[in-house]
Amino acid sequence: ACGGSTLASAAPGAIQAGPDIAIATTPSGKIQGFVHNAILTYRGIPYATAERFMPPQPTRKWADTKMALLYGNICPQSASNPLANFLFSGPHLQQSDDCQNLNIWTPALSDHKPRPVMVWLHGGGFQAGSAIESYAYDGENLSRSGDVVVVSVNHRLNVMGHLDLSAYGQQYQHSANLGVMDLVAALQWIKTNIAQFGGDPNNVTIFGESGGGAKVLTLMATPSAKGLFHKAIVQSGAVEGMGMTLLAPKTTQRVAELTLNNLKLNR
């Protein structure tokens, strides 16, 4: 779930990187980031792994130090989605449904001062967007000015995260909600690991704008997310009308049927 796409830093300044710089030790293994303008930065950290149309699973432990220098994969974007075309006309970002990764910005790994954690959920509804679709989504400035640990999350969207294939087998019973399950998996990872990045797992705020605000509202009503965050900020979001429409299972299964028919896929 750790991709290979890159994005240049938005702010000028010297970058410090090396074998002994910005090493965080997590239960899964060591992670190496870099320091930019005195903020430790980690990109593309895998918080889960998943087979296509299947629920996320915990990542396996790794023996070597994992490099977290490059932004990870983002969920595939629809070429016909005008929002996606607008957002991704700039820096190239590698697209894959193997996109369960997050980015972290922190003032320090350990200085005897656990910091509040702010988890950014990107806009674009549940259809498009990514954790780093805009230079403004780089968390360095917020981490510095607010003295907080900032996390941004990529997760499955559109048909990769919300196509209801439940009519085609028990193994697909959760396929309509995989995007939300990814978000819960990210919050679980944060609860377990964020202390290793200087964050306070008992002081986590989720926040998002537009469709990201809708995700915040959705998580507030998701039982499996209970206890994984403690505060919420909704910026111009609504559950319906922000890329999300609540439909009956019969309707969502029909959408899946039409999708497979249009793709001429055997079931």
Which ranges hold each PLM region?
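N-terminal Sec signal peptide cleavage junction
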Residues: 2-4
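Non-catalytic accessory segments of hydrolases
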Residues: 7-177
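Mature extracellular catalytic domain of secreted serine hydrolases
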Residues: 67-90, 170, 174-175, 181-185, ...
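Gly/Ser-rich "nucleophile elbow"/oxyanion-hole loop immediately N-terminal to the catalytic nucleophile
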Residues: 109-114, 165-181, 185-207
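Glycine-rich nucleophile elbow surrounding the catalytic serine of serine-hydrolase chemistry
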Residues: 127, 208-218
